């Protein structure tokens, strides 16, 4: 009887130890995934900031295009030309799929440097060196990317009593975490005053 009791107690101790070990492993994995998602979120925020500098300035980069916004044509889709890369007109999903993922996923997944339609972090602000990346360690695996979409909302015809006219742009940015599959997409709307003479 005593032997059975001892074996039962040892079994209970082993089960409790196994469950505790599993909980610790799951907690550590959860913390790692959360850190990875937070890294991707912060990278997407940085891309939004870079796009805002791209649109509004101050920007002293040789590739800067602050004065071009409002003047660039905004047709359907996104531009892949070097000087207006990442600038888009109206983006619409296919008639059968109305999700935002269907609009932006093909744009951000294109890695071909000659046909890509997104702007990379620092491409037009000369801040590339401000965002280190690494395939190992605690840095994002890729630099964040963004597209700037000309909003259909127009505020160019506002009277002086209401306020100054401005153009509105929708920025969509994607940030990557420590793993390429960890991605966070953020959007923001920027309004840029239109110069009036």
Short names for language-model regions:
Residues 1-6, 10-197:
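Terminal alpha-helical segments
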């Amino acid at each position: 009887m005593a032997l059975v009791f001892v074996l039962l107690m040892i079994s209970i101790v082993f089960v409790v130890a196994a469950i505790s070990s599993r909980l610790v492993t799951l907690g550590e994995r959860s913390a790692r995934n959360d850190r990875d998602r937070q890294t991707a979120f912060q990278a997407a925020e940085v891309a939004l900031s870079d796009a805002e500098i791209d649109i509004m300035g101050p920007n002293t980069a040789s590739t800067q295009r602050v004065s071009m916004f409002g003047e660039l044509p905004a047709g359907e889709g996104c531009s892949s030309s070097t000087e207006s890369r990442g600038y888009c007109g109206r983006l619409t999903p296919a008639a059968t799929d109305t999700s935002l993922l269907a609009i932006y996923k093909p744009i951000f997944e294109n890695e071909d440097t000659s046909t890509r339609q997104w702007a990379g972090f620092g491409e037009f602000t000369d801040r590339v060196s401000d965002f280190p990346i690494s395939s190992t360690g605690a840095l994002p695996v890729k630099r964040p990317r963004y597209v700037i979409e000309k909003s259909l909302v127009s505020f160019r015809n506002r009277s002086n009593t209401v306020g100054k006219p401005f153009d509105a742009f929708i920025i969509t940015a994607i940030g990557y975490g420590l793993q390429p599959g960890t991605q966070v997409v953020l959007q923001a709307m920027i309004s840029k005053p239109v110069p009036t003479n």
